Amino acid sequence: DVSFSLSGSSSTSYSKFIGALRKALPSNGTVYNITLLLSSASGASRYTLMKLSNYDGKAITVAIDVTNVYIMGYLVNSTSYFFNESDAKLASQYVFAGSTIVTLPYSGNYEKLQTAAGKIREKIPLGFPALDSAITTLFHYDSTAAAAAFLVIIQTTAESSRFKYIEGQIIMRISKNGVPSLATISLENEWSALSKQIQLAQTNNGTFKTPVVIMDAGGQRVEIGNVGSKVVTKNIQLLLN
């Protein structure tokens, strides 16, 4: 289990936390030196916990599915909150034992969360101040702000663990929030496709069977077609199996 506290935090403590989160995910080996996540896991071994504390020291404990870094739910004191989906319902049988379970009115995917938040990710600022607010919102479970809070937490933890570029984007926003770059959104959307193509490239001389189009930092469309790309060699840290 891993933890991150905003109180006394720095770029170093955040990077250490993201590194610890990556290491907390069991691996099926590597593909082109990138960690390949497990294709499945059963029982309690399918989950790892992540404790997040705001500047005030208030903490939530988040349950993560180790096969895909998806957030299932979280615990505050003796109450747990889980997304309204079958995977999260299953998780509730193995984590936060003895807690009172509240089922949230939405599932944990971006589309559903954006609909509930009434905002797309492109419009929701990220950064340490945003993370502080998000933890506070979930700690008190403010239902009107919870969906947007999840969008902040997912990107600041899971997405940062998947992509070094996103980790760097959060670090740039330590003192001041900023909306995510187009490249950030694009990498988030294409993680599954990139994971698949990098694995297929093993038997295809390093070439993708189907190129993946992403936006670069300057907002230009870039076609990624092989494992020599910087996205593969320098950026992606985890592969969905």
Curated annotation (Swiss-Prot):
The protein's enzyme class: hydrolase
Q: Which Gene3D superfamilies match?
A: Ricin (A subunit), domain 1, Ricin (A Subunit), domain 2
Give the active-site positions. E159
InterPro entries on file: Ribosome-inact_prot_sf, Ribosome_inactivat_1/2, Ribosome_inactivat_prot, Ribosome_inactivat_prot_CS, Ribosome_inactivat_prot_sub1, Ribosome_inactivat_prot_sub2
Going by the UniProt annotation, this protein carries glycans at N28, N33, N77, N84, N205
Name the keywords, alphabetized. Glycoprotein, Hydrolase, Plant defense, Protein synthesis inhibitor, Toxin
Q: Which GO terms describe its biological process?
A: defense response; negative regulation of translation
What domain of life? Answer: Eukaryota
GO MF terms here are: rRNA N-glycosylase activity; toxin activity
Show the catalytic activity: Endohydrolysis of the N-glycosidic bond at one specific adenosine on the 28S rRNA
Provide an example Pfam family for this protein: RIP
Q: Does the keyword Glycoprotein apply?
A: yes
Q: What are its E.C. numbers?
A: 3.2.2.22
* Stated family: Belongs to the ribosome-inactivating protein family. Type 1 RIP subfamily.
Q: What is the protein name for this chain? A: Ribosome-inactivating protein luffaculin 1
